[in-house]
Amino acid sequence: MAAKFLRFSYMSNNAPHRHHYVPRMVQRNFTNESGGLHFWRRGMNIGEVRITKPSNLFVEDHLYTIVDKNGARDHSIEHWFGRLETLAAPFIQQFLNIVRHGMTPIMNGTHWDLWHIYVYHAQKRTVAWHKRFLTPEDLLAVMKEIASEQQWREHIRAWETDAEDTLREMNNARIASQADPMPDKMLVEFRSRGLVIYVAPPQTSFILGDDMSGDALVSSRGGTTDARRVQFMPIAPDVAVGYCDTRGVHTDHLTAMDVRRMNEAMAKQSYLIAGRSKAQIASLSRIPYDPPDIMKGWFKSRNGALPACLP
């Protein structure tokens, strides 16, 4: 299964130029009865909430497009993400149906690996943050970290000769890395973990943000009195998921305050938030902005850390 959808074909020119960094198949799980999502983005007035369709949210032009030196555009990575989402979408819907009937999903090895790979690449789809926040100097710092001494000298010469073309190549490399397969060592680590299903109580709902996952302090459980930190990824208004140290699939029924804290954590790190409730999004628009340190996260991942949805 993993090998099937990790195969990659280059030089595909027939693709939409609008690329979603939060998949529409996830966004559609959050829409209201009319198929819309309430949203707010920084720069809008506090409390000013609008509504639109998933096709217009969490999207940028040519986000995953590689450009050659002649200006030709290659959309292979967008096609690749589309194939991955085509595999993940029916699995997620079946998963949600089981949870909503009060049952615990039974996952075989194929299900687990599909989920691990989907989560891994969902975490890597922070290219929008890279594009918005990283400077050429940041990209050079990344290059220096991964290059040999000889490669670094060659890169500096190229930068001094043609900075614009060198920056294009650096951007291409950063974009292409989104489709790099999960390292075998990391997949082994994923397989050693369990899955927690976080269920929101009635009259509450999760939101979506720029990053598909977050972490928050929630109430205690199991007789303890201390708050606990959980890392989670919302996949529907009533369901989020995360990893844990105990193998198997586990269900965690949250309180309304838990969901609020998790939504505040998502809003705090996001430029754009969206959800089913207009009043909820208006309230969360008051949360101050504290975006994640991308460079710190990148260097941490280079040292073998697991993605953010893992404890």
Where are these regions (language model features)?
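Alpha-helical structural context detector biased toward long hydrophobic helices
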Residues: 5-311
